[in-house]
UniProtKB/Swiss-Prot annotation:
It is a lipid-anchor. Its main location: membrane. Substrate binds at residues 52, 77, 83, 103-104, 148, 193, 196, 251-254, 274, 307. The keyword Transport applies. It is found in: Cell membrane. Disruption phenotype: Grows readily on glucose and maltotriose, but is not able to grow on glycogen. Deletion mutant is still able to depolymerize glycogen to some extent resulting in alpha-glucooligosaccharides increasing in size from maltotetraose to maltooctaose and larger oligosaccharides. Keywords: Cell membrane, Lipoprotein, Membrane, Palmitate, Signal, Sugar transport, Transport. Residues 1-24 form the signal peptide. It comes from Streptococcus pneumoniae serotype 4 (strain ATCC BAA-334 / TIGR4). The gene is malX. This is Maltooligosaccharide ABC transporter solute-binding lipoprotein.
Length: 423
């Protein structure tokens, strides 16, 4: 699976802002109903990232046998396909079904680029995944396909058991074997890219912070400067005081973390499922577990993410596309998705099937996902990433105290939303 597509929510940041502005600048597609008749449909086109090719090829055979409809597969840059969806809808040159990260679903739907999707009983959704495909207007624009969450990787050659609490991690930091060469008093026992807001949000939210109110749908209610956020930021700063200076590099910290872990100099890190293959290739004897509980005893409430099946607005036959989406999110096809891609199914029955395979990464993601908060999928989220990154850097580097950094970030977020969205 393309790591670029898998970790889209984690790394889009300003890229998300640019793509959303591209969509916003395009003319909204006329809100006309697609043809609902499907009796004459003999072929459907699905557009996906190259990593889903073998999965679609297998389930397409079953669908052709069941429905008598041929499924034509097109592969390419899935994110790029979403970026030009506004133009493709205007020309009518769109696939019948495609895939989108959850954080793109609500904004594209609200902007008129996606058709509404009905969630069938066979989809077996839960509250979190349903929220991830529901826009601020209350309409559903995608069918949940995959779930993702940050997890903890740990080196089994360095620690016998997975750390359970942040107190455990603090104790590891006292061990001299994790001392960072060249910087006295600095440790790499535990590392996390906490100037990246996607990675840090679980720390802040676990202390009571939130991005937007009403489950991420109310952009007028911003909770990144409340008391819980300040507690979380200050806790992050306490770690930066222990970490090498390079951890403050907002562009290079991720590479530093990966290198230290792969070289056996770091016992535990927080990262996403997309990093597992790199650790396998580096022959790290690693384990995967849920992220340790915070000092306040609460869970690390990371963003819940993943991908959904969506239907472009300009499809010629909405009913036929909907039927294929229903087929894709049903339990049996979701089981095949896991077997072919090792990505965690959104369907709760298929998720249980995946958990039964006793794979550490799968189990950790499923357990961690239960404690996640939906990544806001409204367009205004594009105004959050850069100010939040600056907030974290300013605080952990000591350029501002946590309260000032948070207040400044919220002020900038509000100003940006007002400028770009008129709110």
């Amino acid at each position: 699976m393309s790591s670029k597509f898998m970790k889209s929510a984690a790394v889009l940041g300003t890229a998300t802002l640019a793509s959303l502005l591209l969509v916003a600048c395009g003319s909204k597609t006329a809100d006309k109903p697609a043809d609902s008749g499907s009796s004459e449909v003999k072929e459907l086109t699905v557009y996906v990232d190259e990593g889903y090719k073998s999965y679609i090829e297998e389930v397409a055979k079953a669908y052709e046998k069941e429905a008598g409809v041929k499924v034509t597969l097109k592969t390419g840059d899935a994110l790029g396909g979403l970026d030009k969806l506004s133009l493709d809808n205007q020309s009518g040159n769109v696939p019948d079904v495609m895939m989108a990260p959850y954080d793109r679903v609500g904004s594209l739907g609200s902007d008129g680029q996606l058709s509404e999707v009905k969630l069938s009983d066979g989809a077996k959704t839960d509250d979190t995944t349903k929220s991830l495909v529901t826009a601020a207007n209350g309409k559903v624009y995608g069918a949940p396909a995959v779930i993702e969450s940050l997890v903890m990787y740990y080196n089994k050659d360095l620690v016998k058991d997975a750390p359970k609490t942040f107190a455990d991690l603090e104790n590891l930091a006292k061990d001299s074997k994790y001392a960072f060469a060249g910087e006295d008093g600095k440790t790499t026992a535990f590392l996390a890219d906490w100037t990246n807001f996607y990675y840090t949000y679980g720390l802040l939210a676990g202390n009571g912070a939130y991005v937007f109110g009403q489950n991420g749908k109310d952009a007028k209610d911003i909770g990144l400067a409340n008391d819980g956020s300040i507690v979380g930021i200050n806790y992050a700063k306490s770690w930066y005081e222990k970490w090498p200076k390079g951890m403050q590099d907002t562009e290079g910290a991720g590479n530093l973390i990966q290198t230290q872990f792969q070289e056996g100099k770091t016992a535990a890190i927080i990262d996403g499922p997309w990093k597992a293959q790199a650790f396998k290739d580096a022959k790290v004897n690693y384990g995967v577990a849920t992220i340790p509980t915070l000092p306040n005893g609460k869970e690390y409430a990371a963003f819940g993410g993943g991908k959904a099946w969506v239907i472009p607005q300009a499809v010629k036959n909405l009913e036929a596309s909907q039927k294929f989406v229903d087929f894709l999110v049903a339990t049996e096809q979701q089981k095949v998705l896991y077997d072919k891609t090792n990505e965690i199914p959104a369907n709760t029955e298929a998720r249980s099937y995946a958990e039964g395979k006793n794979d550490e990464l799968t189990t950790a993601v499923i357990k961690q996902f239960k404690n996640t908060q939906p990544l806001p999928n409204i367009s205004q989220m594009s105004a959050v990433w850069d100010p939040a990154k600056n907030m974290l850097f300013d605080a952990v580097s000591g350029q501002k105290d946590a309260k000032t950094a948070a207040n400044d970030a919220v002020t900038l977020i509000k100003e940006t939303i007002k400028q770009k969205f008129g709110e």
